[in-house]
Each structure stands twice: as C-alpha cells, then as structure tokens.
Amino acid sequence: MNEKYAALRANVGMLGQLLGKSIKDHQGQAFLDKIETIRQLAKSSRKGNEADRERLLETLRTLSDDELLPVARAFSQFLNLANVAEQFHTISRRCEEQVCTPDPLEQMFAKLKASNLSQEAIIQAVRELDIDLVLTAHPTEVTRRTLIHKHVQLNDCLEALELSDLLPRERDKILNRIEQLVNQAWHTNEIREQRPTPVDEAKWGFAVVENSLWPAIPEFMRNLDERLQQHLGVRLPLDAAPVKFTSWMGGDRDGNPFVTAKVTAEVLELGRWMAVSLFYKDIKELTSELSMSDCTDAVRERVGDHPEPYRALVRELREALRETQEYLTAKVQGQVSESRDLITTTAQLREPLELCYHSMHACGMGNIADGMLLDVLRKLACFGIHLVKLDIRQDGERHGQVFSELTRYLGMGDYAEWSEDDKQAFLLNELNSRRPLIPTDWEPSDETRETIDTCRVIAQHDPDAFGIYIISMAGAPSDVLAVQLLLKEAGCKFRMPVAPLFETQEDLMAGTAVMERLLSVDWYRGYIQGRQYVMIGYSDSAKDAGMMAAGWAQYAAMESLVALAEASNLRLTLFHGRGGTVGRGGAPAHQAILSQPPGSLRGGLRVTEQGEMIRFKFGLPKVAIHSLNLYTSAVLEGNLLPPPKPKESWRAVMEQLATVSCDHYRSIVRGHPDFVPYFRAATPEMELGKLPLGSRPAKRKPNGGVESLRAIPWIFAWTQNRLMLPAWLGAHKGLEHAITDGQKSVLEEMSRQWPFFRTRLEMLEMVFLKADLWLAEYYDTRLVPQELWNLGKQLRQELADAIQIVLQLRPQGDLLDDQPWIKESINLRNPYTDPLNVLQVELLGRSRSHTETLHPELDQALMVTIAGIAAGMRNTG
C-alpha cells in the first residue's frame, strides 16, 4: 500500500465503513457479509488469484433477483463516496505535492520571471487573458442533482474534520453528520425517474454557478491580482475578466428537438433572474458593510448630505435589483408584470459601485474597498446581468432547409440543388438588400418555422446575453452566410459571431480552405471586423478516424487556421469541443492546452466543459479555484513560452501514424461485417437508451447504425465493457508500423520533446490501466453469439499488443509510473468496479433472455451498474 496517500485511504475507509453500517441497518448483517465477501474476492482476483476469480463469478451469478439491486447499489455508492474523498483530497491540507500543484500561478510567475521575457510582455499577456469555459449538458452525467448536493455537504464535513483544534464533541458532531449524509444517500434512488428537460439541464448549470463558481471567481481573481502585484508591481483593472462562462444548456439544438425557441427564451430569462437574485443577495450584504461617512465630492453630488453616503448609493441599487427580481419572477412564472425602472445592463450596477470603490481609495479606505466591494465588481465583470452567455448551435442542414423551402415557394428553384457559387451569390445579394426576403403570407414547415423563431429570439434579446452561433457539419462558406441572412431577416441589429464547426477528419482537413474562401468575401470581412471563431470537433473526428488520426487532423487544422489568421490580420479564437474521455479529446487541462500548436492561444481559449467534468473540475469552490488557476497558468505558458514547432521528421512520422491508424480503425469499425452486431451484443449500447440521462436523443437518426450514433453514447458503451475501444483502436498499428520502419528513436525523441505526442502516449497509458482484458472476454463469453467470438478475440489481442507497444516507448517502468496519483486513483477503484461489470453481464444476460418485460427491479439494477461503472471509470462519455 502506498503510504503517500494514507489520508485519502483513511477517508475512503471511513466512508466505506459508514456505508457498510447503513447497509447492515437496512439489509441485515448477512447481506453486509456477502458484500464484504464479494469485495475481498474482487481484490484477490485483481491480484491474479484465479480460484478467487471463479468464486467471485459464482457468487455474483447465483444472486437471487431481489439481491441484484442492493448489491449493485452497494458498489455503486461506494464508488461515488470514493470520488468524494478523492475530490476532497485534491484540496485537502494533507494533499501531496504530486497530487496538488501547490499554487500553479505562483509557479508560473516565477517561471516567467526566470525567462528572458520583458516585464511588459508578461503584464500584457495577463491583461489579454481571455478564457471562455463553455458549460454543456452531458447525456452521460449520470449522478442525480440531489446526490451531488449530499456529496458537496460530505466534502464540507471532511474539510471540517481536518481542523487540528476540534473539541471531542465537535468532532463527534461532524462524524454524526457524515453518517447521516451517507445514510441519506443509501436511501436515495440514484437513478432519476424521468429524463431531464433542457430547462432542467440549464437549471443544473445555474446551480453550479450559484454554489461553486460565484464564490470561486472573487477568490481566484484576488489570487491572480496578488501574484501580479507581488511579481510585477501592477494590479488588474477593475473590469478585468480573464475567465468568463458560456452555456450550451438551452441553446444547443443540434439533434435535440426538445430545445425550441421557446425553451431558449425561457432559459435566457432564468439566467437573468438568477444573476439578479445573486447580485441582490450580495448588495444586501454589502449595504451592511458600507457604514463609512468619508467620501469624495463625486459621491456627495450623488447622495447629498446623507450621513452614510455609500449606504445611500448602494441602497438605490438594492431597491432596483429587488424590483427587477420581482418583475423577472412574474415573467418566468408566465404572469404579466408592469415594466418598472429595471436593471437591464451591467453598467447600471458597475457605475455606482466603481464610484464607491474609487472614493474609498481616495479617502484612505483602500483596504475596505478591496474587500467585499471589489468581490462584487469582479463578479460583475465575469458574470454580468445574464450570469452566463448562451451559445446557439444548430445543424447546417436546417438552415439550408429554410432556403430550400423559401426558394421553392418564390419560384426560384431548389436552393439545395444550387452550386456553391450560386448559393453565395443569392445570399450576398439578399444580405446587401434593404427589402425583406421572407413574405408575410408564407407558411413554412414546423422545422423551418422553429429555425426562424430561434433567430427571432436572438434578435429580441440583449447582445450581451449571447456567445456565438455554431453551425454543425459546416462544409462551405454558404453555411455561414446562410445563418447571417437568417439573423438579418429576423431583425437582429447586432453582429452575432458565427462559427463553423469542423468535426470529421475530412472537414478538419478542408477547414482552412473553407475559411479562406469565406474570408475572400468582402461583405463577410466587413461583418466580422477582424474577429473570427472556429470550432474544432474532437468527439466526432475521433469516432470517424480513431484517436491518433483525429488528434493529428485537429493539430494540423489548428496550425493552418492560425497561419491563415495571421496572414489575414485576424484575431482567431479556436473553440475546442472536447469531452472528458480520451476518445473525445479529453486530457488534463494543462496538458491539453500545452499540446496545441504554437500561436493557437493568441486569440484566447474557448473550450467545452461537460456534465461530469464540470462536477469534477468546478463542483466545489476550492476545486473550481484550483482548476481556474491551472487554466490561467497553462494559457500564459502556452502564449509566452510556447511548445516547439514540430520538426519535419516528427511531421513525417505523424503523417504515417495517422494514415496507418485511420486505415486500421476504419477497416474494423466500418469494414468488418461482424462489427455492428458484435458492438451491440458486447456492450450495453441498446440498453443505454433506457437510462434517463440527458435531454438529447442518443442517435441523430432513430433507425441508423453506428455512424448515426452520437459520439458520447459510442464512447460510453465501450467504457462499460472495459474494452475502451475508441480510445486506442488504430493507434497501436500506427506506432507498430513506425517502430518496424526503424523510427523508434524518432518516436522516443517526440515523446521527450513534443507535448502534443507525449500527451497522446500518456492518455493511452491511462486508458490501458482502466481497460480489462479478462472482463472484456467475460462480456463476450456470456453475451456475444459464438459466431462473433473471433472478432472479440482479435480485438482483445490487439489491446494486449497495444499495451506492449506503448510500454516499448516508455523510458522505463510500468504504465503511469510517472503519474503515481492517477495510477493510485485507478487502482483504488478497480476492485469496486469489477463486481459491477460482472453484475452488469448477469443483468444483461437475464434482460436479453426475457422476451416479456423485465422486472422493474432488475431494470433498475442494470441502470445502477451503468451509473456505477461510470463513477468507477471517472469519465463517462
């Protein structure tokens, strides 16, 4: 056992014992003994004891129907508690340096000062920081909000236990509260009864802001400001917002028919209501703080001879916020309310607060001004009165459909059949025209009306409420111009940024040519005014070509887009659509940022944060502060001390790796006749549809095959059976080919000197430690028809070969030896995840052999194993 993580193991042990007590009180000692037997057998099986492995299988196979659900719940709940303990450990006082970078910003400023950079260059880079974290609903965020809330409270209790001067009765009180929370969790159904609506998802996002990001931002800003003062002698401006938040929840309608224009409008109002409510609380508290009487003439002019000038100013704000809150409450509830003197812009709040701030500093009260008042100003700069900006995303085909219907109605032929040049000519002509294009008597289809209504919602709201408009499957300049024309026709008076999303390997490779053609359009250059966004899709490109080929396609696309932006004198912001898993572009934030091409961060960083990753990275204020520090230090390093440009020899090897790995990946996923039936038999893909996860359907087309399956359930299914196929398939063949071709020394050099390549290998190592050949084989022998066994055997052999190939490229040691914390984290969970896998196989077998409807408890048990394995793997889709 690794003594280094003794504090973590002690907390895991304590929570496990309390869960055991809850189980015993509810199910009896005999049942708890059975759970403990299964746990010990799983640990022994992990160590290679074949006899205990057989006993484990026998014990789980012979469970009665009414035992399956509580056994699944016991292991699933333990894994959730282990995650709570681990998340706490990363912010604990006892956290080891290998786990928690003590202060990433402090280390970064020291590193920058030690470099040859001028002080002015560093200050400029800090002032130009532009990090936009985009919160997205996640179809595989399997943990219910009610359980997340209990887990947050558990975290608070673990923190309180660390205080060294606790009295015995205080300690007992905390331990009793922990016991209550564990007991509450055990008696709470972990699977939600109904699929969440898009509005439910948006409320979940707002709850993350309220509970975690709202308190985290002022602390993060204070830390950054102090480091800047300490190292460079300057402070951040009052309106500095190096980090901002955007949301897709209620705005992302690509493939989700439940996100309508009405839903988007409702989510926008809810966001405003939440922001006003939070600022009202803060301003109310601030009123009690600002009792001072000294002030500048500028404040006196506003409040007259009031004895408490700051309170007088802030009370006016408080009343305006209260009125706005009442108005928005009525509006959200569908009631008509009189429009009064409402807060409609961030400036209405900022101006009087800045007046107070400058007055206090002028009157020798800078220390007071830099307290809660500065915190409110920092929140205003970050969140504004909309809380988060809302992105809109729609499939490019839907915009084309509007113009197809319209041109047919107008007798102009079918827009869909026109050449790209004809489409552009039509769109540009209409963009330059002053007359409306859409006739008032036109009756479009429901889908087309919905697309137009969405643009009208955008036109009716404040520009500050929105981020950007993203077009999925964008392949031509007309895709972008079509959206701009729709916005014009809807009466939109502001220039909403429109970003094409390049997501397949082919789209990524063609992306720069598309942008080049678009930028050659004079009207478009005038519209964007020197600022362009492009979204890079990680999930679909990996599903399309495999992780290695997709990674290189993403890198090459970014590199050529950056070169185009420089040549065109544009500020380009690359928007990274990454997931939490390796198969969807996931990697620790710092590594992912530093493995991007040099120059790709000049226009800022914009990246999606999804479902379960939002919870792991931003679910607690202290965890959120640490994550924000990591992002900031990584972006500063990426801009000021960028990684080297790849050598020509490295590029040649990567081209070869990408070609070989993509060919092999596609030969299996697209070319093997048995692949689709094998995938459906060997994973719970068909059963995943039953799980009431996100609001979005799992498939783009209900009757489609693997190609229509969304990237998230595709990854989720392979994670469940522990083959982890999308995260490695193809990569090993590329590496093997390069080694056989005499390029091993080049690969080793790439691993040492090039963050992009090193990150790929590290991600493979993590995946290999989570994968399990024995369990993958067990799924096959129990669930897969015998005529498909050969494919399963081939894939497992390829996984075993892949592990050996990656080990060859390690300087020494075993998988993840140089990342002991991640290794410890995976090893801690594996013995608790393994029984859930065996149980899942048992439940899938019973479910598939029942022609009639399965007993609800067995259905529930299957859902619990899916959620539990997701918790054990720590990243789902």
From Swiss-Prot:
Secretion signal, residue range per the UniProt entry? none
Keywords of this entry:
Carbon dioxide fixation, Lyase, Magnesium
Tell me which cofactor or cofactors this protein depends on.
Answer: Mg(2+)
Output the Gene Ontology cellular-component terms.
Answer: cytosol
Q: Which family does it belong to?
A: Belongs to the PEPCase type 1 family.
**What does this chain do?**
Forms oxaloacetate, a four-carbon dicarboxylic acid source for the tricarboxylic acid cycle.
Q: What is this protein called?
A: Phosphoenolpyruvate carboxylase
Organism of derivation: Aeromonas salmonicida (strain A449)
